[in-house]
């Protein structure tokens, strides 16, 4: 196995971080790795993948994969390559989450992918309440070892499947139904006067739901395709995007994964100097 393709969907950066770390680890073992971010705007004609191993990474939304992930998989044609499906969640592999990959795996198999490996990676929670420093330091300090384990499983082409609790099939089904209302979150975002029209929210919107004329520094306009990844709200440098529908699901103090990572690196450096 020489060639590996990693596709990932990310909102606030957790899945992207996992994808980049895993890619670096696999490259260090002399594998050819292509990394691609999933945007709804890039889902066009059917794409046939020619790779030795395929890895799909996504955050858990409502106990399932985000809608654009399903749309992405449905536009792919596999070559029966061995495949890993990796979900990312603040709760990790707990009850309510064990069936979060089921629909994605089913769609991949239908598209001629040989799914042999399923995994869950825990990252700091971004829903309702962001973790405190002690909590996210504990989570992120374990990430390198987890990435090493995943890389070794991929390289050795081992078959590993997760146990799924029967109640989670029902929970995931309810989560799928809940997604029908996520567009209301995007429609309900209020753009405050602090907005500079920088265009960062539109550039990074994985659902292609935000329109803005960056040259004119106009304020963003939200469509009806929001998947509630929370990326635009948390990543706005001016904190100028204020949710009105479902606002309780956003931590008013913000969520900054880069800052968390820097703090963890600083703690590690301090320990090494002791």
Regions from the PLM with identified roles:
Residues 8:
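A charged nuclease-like catalytic/ligand-binding cleft shared by nucleic-acid processing domains
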Residues 191, 196, 200-221, 231-248:
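Iron-sulfur cluster-binding cysteine motifs and their immediate structural context
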Residues 225:
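C-terminal active-site rim and adjoining tail of enzyme catalytic domains
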Residues 2-4, 12-18, 25-38, 48-58, ...:
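FMN-binding flavodoxin-like domain, especially the glycine-rich phosphate-binding loop
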Residues 169-199, 203-206:
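A mid-sequence, solvent-exposed acidic-amphipathic segment
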Residues 2, 31-32, 185-187, 218:
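Generic structural motif recognizing short loop/turn segments at the entrances and edges of beta-strands
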Residues 42-45:
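Short acidic active-site motifs
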């Amino acid at each position: 196995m020489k060639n590996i393709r990693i596709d990932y969907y990310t909102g606030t950066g957790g899945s992207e971080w996992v994808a980049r770390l895993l890619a670096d680890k696999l490259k260090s073992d002399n594998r050819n790795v292509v990394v691609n971010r999933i945007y709804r705007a890039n889902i066009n004609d059917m794409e046939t993948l020619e790779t030795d191993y395929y890895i799909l990474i996504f955050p858990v939304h409502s106990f399932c994969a985000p809608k654009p992930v399903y749309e992405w998989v449905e536009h792919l044609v596999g070559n029966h390559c061995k495949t890993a499906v990796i979900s990312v969640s603040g709760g990790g592999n707990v009850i309510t989450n064990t069936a979060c990959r089921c629909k994605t795996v089913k769609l991949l198999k239908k598209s001629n992918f040989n799914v042999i490996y399923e995994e869950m990676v825990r990252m700091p929670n971004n829903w309702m309440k962001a973790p405190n420093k002690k909590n996210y330091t504990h989570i992120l300090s374990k990430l390198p070892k987890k990435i090493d384990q995943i890389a070794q499983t991929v390289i050795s082409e081992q078959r590993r499947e997760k146990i799924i609790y029967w109640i989670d099939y029902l929970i995931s089904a309810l989560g799928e139904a809940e997604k029908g209302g996520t567009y209301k979150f995007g429609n309900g975002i209020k753009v405050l006067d602090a907005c500079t029209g920088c265009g960062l929210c539109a550039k990074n919107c994985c659902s292609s739901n935000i329109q803005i004329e960056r040259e004119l520094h106009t304020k963003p306009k939200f469509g009806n395709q929001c998947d509630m990844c929370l990326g635009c709200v948390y990543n706005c440098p001016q904190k100028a995007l204020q949710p009105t529908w479902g606002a309780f699901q956003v931590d008013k103090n913000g969520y900054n994964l880069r800052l968390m990572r820097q703090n963890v690196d600083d703690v590690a450096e301090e320990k090494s100097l002791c």
